[in-house]
Amino acid sequence: EISECLVGSEMCIRDRDINYLIGGDLINQIVPSSFAARELGIPFFGIYGACSTMAEGMCLSAMLIDGGFADLILSGASSHYCTAERQFRFPLELGNQKPMTAQWTVTGAGSVLIAPNKEGPKVKYVTVGKVIDEGIDDGNNMGPAMAPAAVDTIYSYFNDTKDDPNSFDLIITGDLGKIGKQITED
């Protein structure tokens, strides 16, 4: 029950108050997210965006609320290191050495409640990225593969909104690794 997660909070929210659950993870068929949805009994949109799942869920939630289709949405993402290694790279049991360029998938989860006209952080704009494929196919060096899309999305955001990059404390992307980060900064 969701209300157990909010004990001590000023918000009194129960499962029945939430219109939709939007979530995903890095496992085939988003099984963990589907199991959570089964337990909660909230209408569920399962998404799979790999590194972008959390941001994707928040964007979709904000658009559904702004469009008047919902009043309260729970959006979340999870990942598991061992499962991601098995699925995208090599099973840990093989004992392969990770190269210095490899990213490390977190084992963790997070979720947010998105609602209209509430206090706290707001989703002010949504800029959806495009798939930009430069032909990089090294599963142990995905930063350079993701960097062109990150640059394009950041550029599109500032071009569309006319915001000043200097007015931000941070501009955060997914884990581009050392090489992908350098490509993005250049």
List the predicted regions and their residue ranges:
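Active-site loops and adjacent core secondary-structure elements that bind or stabilize anionic groups
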Residues: 11-12
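Condensing-enzyme catalytic core mediating Claisen C-C bond formation in acyl metabolism
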Residues: 1, 91-155, 160
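Single conserved hydrophobic/aromatic residue that forms the stacking wall/gate
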Residues: 1-8
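Oxyanion-binding "anion nests"
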Residues: 150-180
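Short glycine-enriched loops at secondary-structure junctions
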Residues: 23-29, 79-80, 119
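Short glycine/threonine-rich loop-to-helix capping motif typified by GTGT followed
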Residues: 33-37, 176-186
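Active-site-proximal alpha-helical scaffold in enzymes
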Residues: 48-75, 114
